Amino acid sequence: MEEVSVTRHYIAVNAGGWYPLLKTAQDYTEYFHEALSFSDLYETYRYIEKHGLDKIATVITRML
């Protein structure tokens, strides 16, 4: 049986250190279970642009 990996995209907003999604470049925090996530990268960037988060947001892609 072939394994299928699911890619999820999360928006990390620079909020001065509050609710970070990354502990390090390779380690996620417990806040991922509450984070807004997208399955489509285009929709992720569209959400960022629509809500004016261009300068303070970063997209994190996570393979599950």
Task: Describe the predicted segments one by one.
Residues 41-64:
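Short, mixed-charge low-complexity intrinsically disordered segments
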